[in-house]
Regions:
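Extracellular glycan-recognition regions
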Residues: 1-225
């Protein structure tokens, strides 16, 4: 898997080394998120590194996520998204300057994210499925291993299963089943498969422009031949 297979949006940079063999990091500036509260509150401005492929070829993606989470809604993890016809192409977004302030140029029609999120003073395992609007599920993390976890999104026929394992736990556990992912002809559509980092809440005081650096390792993507 070469770096030429990858694209980036919202200020992220494609890693210089192969992401499947070398750890890499994404830094999210404040006021970035992936979240759709309503038709008029639709945000997809989080820095993201991904591959675009036919949805019919997707089998699974897995990655290990780490960061010093400490501000409300700090987050990072896996994301898969169906870009809408109005979504800018990844080629055009990749060429944007790295220091450009993320506005909100990208609005995929449907998406799923799974990762660690900091919520009410604790890191949690968070999963969001967005068909029409976003819904959010949480699971607690142990205080001993609260900064690092591994996630996997796997396709089983028309359904997606999401698995997670905290650092220090060998076996991944099923966290959520999403039935709608590949229904309604979405097998014929393009799919973005990758990782993201987001920091919806700025730091307090003089650090209000400080970003969140999320490190990803052991990234694996499986595709149908």
């Amino acid at each position: 898997m070469s770096t030429s297979d990858w694209s980036s949006i919202n200020g992220a940079s494609v890693p210089k080394e192969d992401p499947s063999t070398e750890p890499f990091a994404i830094t999210a500036p404040p006021k970035t998120d992936i979240w759709r509260r309503s038709e008029t509150d639709d945000v997809f401005n989080a820095p993201t590194v991904f591959q675009e492929l036919p949805a019919s070829q997707f089998k699974s993606i897995a990655v290990t996520v780490y960061a010093p989470w400490h501000t409300q809604y700090d987050q990072g993890g896996l994301v898969i998204a169906f870009p809408s016809s109005a979504t800018p192409s990844p080629e055009r977004e990749t060429k944007k300057a790295e220091n450009e302030s993320p506005e909100n140029p990208v609005r995929p029609s449907k998406w799923i994210k799974a990762g660690i999120e900091f919520f009410e003073l604790s890191a949690v395992l968070g999963i969001v499925g967005t068909d029409r609007f976003s819904d959010w599920s949480l699971a607690p993390m142990s205080q001993e291993f609260h900064q690092k976890a591994r996630f996997k999104i796997e396709r089983k026929e028309k359904t997606l299963w999401i698995y997670a394992a905290q650092d220090g736990v060998e076996k991944m556990k099923p966290m959520r089943e999403i039935k709608w992912a590949f229904m309604e002809g979405r097998d014929e559509e393009k799919l973005w498969v990758g990782v993201y980092a987001a920091k919806p809440t700025p730091e307090d005081g003089e650090d209000d422009e400080k970003g969140l650096e999320v490190t990803f390792s052991d990234l694996v993507i499986e595709k149908e031949e």
